[in-house]
Amino acid sequence: MKIILLGAPGAGKGTQAQFMMNKFGIPQISTGDMFRAAIKEGTELGKQAKALMDEGKLVPDELTVALVKDRIAQPDCANGFLLDGFPRTIPQADALKDSGVKIDLVLEFDVADEVIVERMSGRRVHQPSGRTYHVVYNPPKVEGKDDVTGEDLIIRQDDKPETVLERLAIYHKQTKPLIAYYTAEAEAGNTRYERLDGTKPVEEVSAELAKILG
């Protein structure tokens, strides 16, 4: 099963990716992890990517697609994979298609912006341990304090409402067009497209996913 995950940051893709990895024994592939691995291993593509990144330049789509193709040709992807964070743009989706990679299923996690802002801006973190709380869904016993040590909890820069809104704006501009792209691909019979309501409880979303995946 070759799957693409679409959805804004905070839409719950990571949680459900974990569920699918365990169910099918397929790896989750994120471009960030791939770049780091290729650079660490000193592969030809890794060297090219590093040179560009060191200059503060964006890695071109062709290079990203080449890295993805390299990664999905590895033995652990024989039964499929989950692509998370790629493709991000229409040119990347086109390049992936042109390179001959057949995607079986595109899953969209649909969550309204205001829900995502509430989810992410409500997070509180105990930095030394990495323990995470949420003011609504998983509050600490004492407001603003870690349950174990009693130390202060912080709001990460990434979780501040203004940062979340910025990330959502980028998502809508760059990645939202992919929803129309893959809906059209599904209508043309080239893939299957399923939308999941990411506001439902985790277990419900997982149960729905299990049905879709058969």
UniProtKB/Swiss-Prot annotation:
It catalyses: AMP + ATP = 2 ADP. Residues 30-59 are annotated as: NMP. ATP binds at residues 10-15, 123, 132-133, 200. One of its GO terms (molecular function) is ATP binding. GO terms for biological process: AMP salvage. Gene3D superfamilies: P-loop containing nucleotide triphosphate hydrolases (3.40.50.300). InterPro entries: Adenyl_kin_sub (IPR006259), Adenylat/UMP-CMP_kin (IPR000850), Adenylat_kinase_CS (IPR033690), Adenylate_kinase_lid-dom (IPR007862), P-loop_NTPase (IPR027417). The keyword Transferase applies. Monomer. Catalyzes the reversible transfer of the terminal phosphate group between ATP and AMP. Plays an important role in cellular energy homeostasis and in adenine nucleotide metabolism. Belongs to the adenylate kinase family. Consists of three domains, a large central CORE domain and two small peripheral domains, NMPbind and LID, which undergo movements during catalysis. The LID domain closes over the site of phosphoryl transfer upon ATP binding. Assembling and dissambling the active center during each catalytic cycle provides an effective means to prevent ATP hydrolysis. This is Adenylate kinase.
